[in-house]
Regions:
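Short, charged, surface-exposed hinge/linker loops at domain edges
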Residues: 1-11, 40-118
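A short, exposed loop/beta-hairpin motif centered on an aromatic-Gly-Thr core
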Residues: 26-41
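Short aromatic-glycine-(Arg/Gly/Cys) micro-motifs in beta-strand/loop hairpins
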Residues: 9-30
Length: 118
């Protein structure tokens, strides 16, 4: 089975009561839902969301709108410069990020199937 890699920006959010200690954003998936008390918790949560989205890749038209190349047997994400990753994360969260961590999240491509109502 093939693998899919995307970059995730993880940072300490100044509003920890709302977002958790760490928040994240992935411009390739437009996902800003993964947050938590540790970086490992954030990455684990994001991996689960990414696998779910990849399962639904043939039914989730936004992937193609966001520059992904998807088929029954493959998925290739768009590639972004690190500076863009950080600036988009700052724009989405409306904060200036100190000490951002860019983490490559690599998952096995799951079988394509509809698991959510998209």
């Amino acid at each position: 089975m093939s693998r899919v890699s995307v970059k995730l920006v993880v940072f300490k959010h100044p509003d920890a009561a709302r977002w958790g200690t760490y928040a994240s954003y992935c411009p390739a998936t437009h996902n800003f839902c993964a947050s938590g008390k540790t970086i490992a918790e954030v990455v684990s949560s994001f991996e689960e969301m990414l696998v779910r989205d990849l399962e639904n890749r043939m039914f989730f038209v936004n992937f193609k709108n966001w520059g992904w190349k998807v088929s029954e047997n493959s998925a290739k994400s768009p590639n972004f410069a690190d500076e863009y990753l950080i600036s988009e994360t700052e724009r989405i969260f409306e904060v200036t990020i100190k000490d951002p961590q860019i983490i490559t999240v690599d998952v096995e491509l799951p079988k394509s199937r509809k698991t959510i109502g998209v």
